[in-house]
């Protein structure tokens, strides 16, 4: 059955399906929307007591529900300045060193950091010998993405690509998955050096948003788009540790890259398949 599921992903019209789902998710259909949200809550066992708006009737469309805010204080931020924090609610897929420009995906699969970053050679060079962490957001999870550490935005890259599912089954069976799917790469300058936040699209994930650009929707095609941002002066965008930096419509994956010698060690309990909660300690900063 697993082989059938993977085979179907290669032949199904993933972009068309995602566009259709995106239109439905943005549609305001009153009681139909409310009924669908209630079904989703029950199907995925979502704890709505954590949501700022716990009632399904509070959401005019599915997208509002998918990107729902949490109650203030429900995710306390680790205040130890020696640690960066989890950027999302989800589960660790993989993490570890970037070895010879390669990032581990799953048993028998890896991919290049250069490909992940949209073949931006200068960017990839900044993360040689560094560390990575890949976190999967399931449909049930909180879908907003936050800053692991204070950082100033220096560059954004949009990389067109496939829209394979990014669940654990697909990660174990589709070579180079995260470097094949559509993605948005945001690079920040931080006190520990450059940090890349790679927001990876997936099947029926209708769009990726950032707080500075809104929904990232370059023209359809195979061209990579880049935007450079000032890191000093009145137009520089600096986001504090724990601040929202983006969001997914439904769920997907975040890949983080850090420079060599930026991180000392991952926090206790942070390992593949471990559950992540935004704001908790993720990794200790190198002294």
UniProtKB/Swiss-Prot annotation:
Enzyme nomenclature, EC number: 4.1.1.65
Cofactor note: Binds 1 pyruvoyl group covalently per subunit.
Site (described: Cleavage (non-hydrolytic)): 251-252
Places the protein is found: Cell membrane
PTM text: Is synthesized initially as an inactive proenzyme. Formation of the active enzyme involves a self-maturation process in which the active site pyruvoyl group is generated from an internal serine residue via an autocatalytic post-translational modification. Two non-identical subunits are generated from the proenzyme in this reaction, and the pyruvate is formed at the N-terminus of the alpha chain, which is derived from the carboxyl end of the proenzyme.
Location of Pyruvic acid (Ser) modifications: 252
Listed cofactors: pyruvate
Protein name: Phosphatidylserine decarboxylase proenzyme
Species whose genome carries this gene: Shewanella halifaxensis (strain HAW-EB4)
Name of the coding gene: psd
